């Protein structure tokens, strides 16, 4: 699914975003080499490290990722050639990207955080926010609270992400974690203030 988005400052980049499950249609397009040019791949978690390495190698494109709550294998086998951006504000060309891994705490498993813990992680980045001035894209596994999330404990979003959107006004907030069958690209998007919150379960292609 390709989406052309409207930004105040276009970056002229084509970004492939993936999350949660390996989409057969994407795999076929990658293997057939008919996906078109991709400048950057972004993973929002819960994907096998081998799959991320496959995408990175076949598309010969940098790949940034955050881990999801089911990415227990990453402690032993990180995706080769890919870059973990959790708790970092990184730059790709003109795009400033913030990464935040994991889900809300629900049973004490890996990559689970209370809202207070996540808020502390975000606060610890204050110098990066000050130095780079702007956040264009936030990449997370879980959604913000009451935006695309659910009411069972595992799939609740983070209140701290809502505060982050209100304070930093990123152009994009890209997440996974919430599995849903989308009929059109527009069904993935909720606009909050000036931020496009996008559920990228499966995959999307953003033209930014």
PLM features: residue spans?
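Active-site neighborhood of phospho(di)ester-bond hydrolases with catalytic His/Asp-centered motifs
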Residues: 17-19, 40-46, 64-69, 85, ...
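Active-site environment of divalent metal-dependent phosphoester hydrolases
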Residues: 22-26, 47-53, 69-75, 105-109, ...
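Conserved beta-strand segments of alpha/beta enzyme cores
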Residues: 14, 62-64, 83, 96, ...
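N-terminal active-site segment of His-dependent metallophosphoesterases
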Residues: 1-56, 127, 131-134
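Conserved catalytic scaffold of divalent metal-dependent phosphoesterases
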Residues: 17-25, 71-156, 202
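Short, structured coil segments at secondary-structure junctions
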Residues: 58-60, 80, 192-193
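Binuclear metal-dependent phosphoesterase catalytic core
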Residues: 2-12, 18, 27-29, 76, ...
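A short, gly/pro- and small-residue-rich
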Residues: 59-70, 158-161
